[in-house]
Amino acid sequence: MKVSLMAAKAKNGVIGCGPHIPWSAKGEQLLFKALTYNQWLLVGRKTFESMGALPNRKYAVVTRSAWTADNDNVIVFPSIEEAMYGLAELTDHVIVSGGGEIYRETLPMASTLHISTIDIEPEGDVFFPNIPNTFEVVFEQHFSSNINYCYQIWQKG
């Protein structure tokens, strides 16, 4: 199963401040919506609760709590390992979509990274992990918006 990570991060690596994204770059979330349409997303519970279930997507939510979802498009798993095992039976591609701990644990499994770097350095308490030098940028596009950003695709070498 192919594992991709998709994230928007600030220049200082911040991806969140509590349950919130500390910016709103017009147009950037359209990339997320387009690339995740009809895909399986792997997220942590806090990320899922903050973003909610977008239509036409299926979710594998990882949580250590007794949390359950009242949604046919959501499957809850107690660990990333169990989620990956279960997803391998359901799909050939999963997009990891946060939060910070989930990104850190799945980065070694990923072959592709979809990263939007937002031209801002906000305060925050959740960070995207450093990208290992085993990845290289294979595509890059800059966008002018209310807050400029750069979308990159990284491939593992």
UniProtKB/Swiss-Prot annotation:
EC number of the protein: 1.5.1.3
Gene Ontology cellular component annotations, sorted alphabetically: cytosol
Enzyme class per UniProt: oxidoreductase
Reactions that this protein is recorded to catalyse: (6S)-5,6,7,8-tetrahydrofolate + NADP(+) = 7,8-dihydrofolate + NADPH + H(+)
Assigned keywords, A-Z: Antibiotic resistance, Methotrexate resistance, NADP, One-carbon metabolism, Oxidoreductase, Plasmid, Trimethoprim resistance
Pfam families, A to Z: DHFR_1
Family statement: Belongs to the dihydrofolate reductase family.
The protein's assembly and partners: Homodimer.
Protein name (database record): Dihydrofolate reductase type 5
Organism encoding this protein: Escherichia coli
The gene coding this protein: dhfrV
